[in-house]
Amino acid sequence: MKKTIYTLLTIAMAICFANCEKAILEEGIGKEKQGKGKMKTISLRINEEITTSETPLFANKTRGAGKKLYGINVFQKKASNSSYTKYAYGLFDDPSKISIVLNENCLYRFECLIVEEGEDNLYLSEDGYMEPFITTSKKPTKVNNSFTKSSSVNFPFPPKGQTTITGNKQVWCPKLIKQYGTLLNFDPKTANTVSLKVKRAVFGLHLTIAPPEEGTLEVSYLDDYKETIKASDPTFDHQAVYSFTQTAKAIEDGYNGKFDFVLKWTKSDGTIKTETKAFVLKRNVMTNIKIVIKNPAPSSIAIEEESSEMTNEDIDWTVER
C-alpha cells in the first residue's frame, strides 16, 4: 500500500514539475516574441536636389541620362541602446526596389550616396563596383537591388577619397555627379515610407585654353588632369561637371574648394615658363576659366570674376611674356 501511494505521489510530482517547466518555457517564448517586435516592410523614396542653379550648371551642355547607382546604409538603434549599430547595406540601380523589413520597436538611421555616371563611368570589376562602393571589408559590391543584413559590414560613407573610374583609374574629382544625404531617428511605426533627401556635391568647370604663339602649353589641374596644346592646335574648349572629394561637406550651401592650376609653357627655343594660380570652384556653380598667353612683357595674371549671383562665373587668366 505504501509503495502504491509513493508511486502515485512520484507521478503527481512529475506532472507538476512538467507543467511548471512548460509554463516557464512558454513564458520565455512569449518574452522573446515581445522583444523581437512586429516587423514591417518600409519603402525608401529618394528626393534628389532641384535648385535654381541646376539650369546654369548644365545650360551649355546636353545632359544625357547617365546610369544611377544608389548605395544605402541602414543603422539600427534598439530601445535598450543609446547608439546606432550597423544593420544592412545594399547597392541598387532601380529605386523602385529599395525596401527593407524593419522592427517597429527600434529606430533607424539611413545614409544614401547616389552616383550618376557622366563623362566618367565607375569601374566595374568582375567582383562588382569599386570606390566609392568598396565595403568596410575592402570588397567590391555588385548591384543586387536588395539589402544585405550585416552588423559588421557596410559602405564607408560619406566618401572622402578617390573614385575608381573606367580603366581602374583613381581620381580625386571624377567627371560624374555625386549626391549624398542622411536621415536620423526614423520610427517604422509612424510611416510606411522613408523620405530621404540628398544634395549634390558637385561643381562645374568650363576650361578654355588659347594655343600659344609658339611652342607647347601644358595645363595641369584638379590633381589628375592635364591638357597639352601646341601652337598649331585649335583653341581647347571643354566643359564638365565634377564631384568634390569631401562629399559630406560639399553638400552644404556655399561650399567651395581651392584648386591649383599649373601652367607650363615650353617655347620653341626650349625656354620653359611656369605659372601656378589657385582658383576657387564653388558648389553648383559652372566656373568659366579662360587661359591666354600673349605679348608683351612683363608677365602678369589678370582675373575677372563675375559679380552677379553665384551660378555662373568667368575667370580670365592671361600670361604675358
Residue ranges and their predicted role:
Residues M1-T7:
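Bacterial N-terminal signal peptides that target proteins for export
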Residues G66-E126, G215-V285, T311, I315-R321:
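Tryptophan-paired
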Residues R45-A65, T208-G215:
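Structural motif
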Residues I289-R321:
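Hydrophobic, glycine-enriched assembly/anchoring segments
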Residues T4, C16-T52, N284, T311-R321:
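Bacterial Sec-dependent N-terminal signal peptides
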Residues L8-C16:
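Bacterial N-terminal signal peptides
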Residues T190-Y225:
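Hydrophobic, aromatic-enriched interface-forming segments
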Residues K77-K199:
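Short, low-hydrophobicity acidic/polar segments
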